[in-house]
Amino acid sequence: MNTKHYDLIVLGFGKAGKTLAAKFGSMGKAVAMIEENPLMYGGTCINIACIPTKTMIVAASKGLSYDQVLNQREVVTSRLRNKNFGMLDTNEHVDVYTGHGEFISNKEIDVTAGEDKIVLSGDTIIINTGAVAIKPNIDGIDTASDFYNSTEIQHLSPQPSTLGIIGAGPIGLEFASLYAKLGTKVTVFNIESSILKREEPIVQELANEYLTEQGITILNDVTLNSVSNDGNKPVITANGQNYTFDAVLYATGRKPNTVNIGLENTDITTNERGAIVVNDTCESSVPGVYAVGDVNGGPQFTYISLDDFRIVFGALTGNGQYTLKDRKNIPYTTFLTPPLARIGLTEEDAINKGYTVKTKEMLVATMPRAHVNDYLKGAFKIVVNADNDLILGATLYSQGAEELINLIKMAMDNNIPYTYFKNQIFTHPTMAENLNDLCNF
């Protein structure tokens, strides 16, 4: 069997892995990149998650037809996928293997592409295999048809007239909002007492109101009895009642993708969720083997994968001062209509942790730029430590929230008191200037 040795092997073409491959390739190191699926060059974000779904949301907001939305998705993902492949393929020090990679020992990976096989060995190995959708544990889910995960539904054609969504987390609600924009009648099945249970009460209330205004039916406190088919239609049985749709999306979370990569042939340790256990530099239980991105069980965001790159690159080049224990204040955005951005603690979280807090809420309808935009939906809230005026958390639910939340993060990271925003000079009319009023208390 053919064999080849590399300085660095990357298993999985994700954000952290591809960036490490490009960096070390540019330094003259011999690098191998292994990716099983040519439609995944570049990783989850640009192919099946952040980029395609947000592209679809923007396209739908412009009034494009369903087929046009799908086409725009393909145009954008193809462009970025080809760019990412070219970034490595044109590097003379990087070999890209399109095939299935599986460990056969701690530092050897067998790569299979059809009838072709090769064993690659490496001084350093990076595991960047991402995460996969979790299929819900519901009676009938393994045999019923027309039930889709968040990847599969992005290719669904023709457009369903009715769509059931199992799960009311960020993925489920983003797709609910998207399909409602496109004219599909959407029903969301939520096992909790309300949607967005981790968010501030004002957000839960407003989001429920806005989603309902979009024509979305939200069923809370449901017990999912089973799923089945009535002819060629998928059926959800919940609380003893049957609901029939053209298609059903299950959005019940994602888990680390560590199956079928040969970890049983190594000394690499995984936890109860299947995530690879790592230390503060993302190194696994095998020295020289690192796990980055979703596969190590951290927050499932592409910017966290990029941060893993920073940590591993520093560790491998002798500048490992920044580690996982230094990471803090991770913001996130759920792309509802309007977008919902959060960082840090809610008021309830902060009180439960023993903080004495002071807070302020503002409705977007009171903000000048919102009137210019003719879009008055949403609210801001900030939670402050009353003992030292440092920001504990913030929620921004508005147009532009996905951008503004990063200002809050920088203040939190640098221990800047909330009063800094009260006295800051912002341009006018902007959404950012409302941080003056939000922090004036």
At which residue positions do the language-model features occur?
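Rossmann-like dinucleotide-binding cores of NAD(P)H-dependent redox enzymes
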Residues: 42, 75-85, 154-155, 160-164, ...
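A Rossmann-like FAD-binding core segment of flavoenzymes
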Residues: 95-97, 102-115, 120, 183-280
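Beta1/beta-strand and adjacent pyrophosphate-binding region of the FAD-binding site
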Residues: 2-14, 159-169
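Residue-level detector of alpha-helix initiation sites
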Residues: 14-19, 40, 45, 133, ...
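FAD-site-proximal beta/loop scaffold in flavoenzymes
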Residues: 143-158, 242-319
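Glycine-rich dinucleotide-binding loop and its adjacent helix/turn
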Residues: 50, 129-189, 217-218, 264-281, ...
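N-terminal Rossmann-like dinucleotide/flavin-binding domain of flavoprotein oxidoreductases
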Residues: 3-4, 44-121, 199-225, 347-349, ...
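Flexible, glycine-rich terminal cap/loop adjacent to redox cofactors
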Residues: 11-39, 44-46, 51, 56, ...
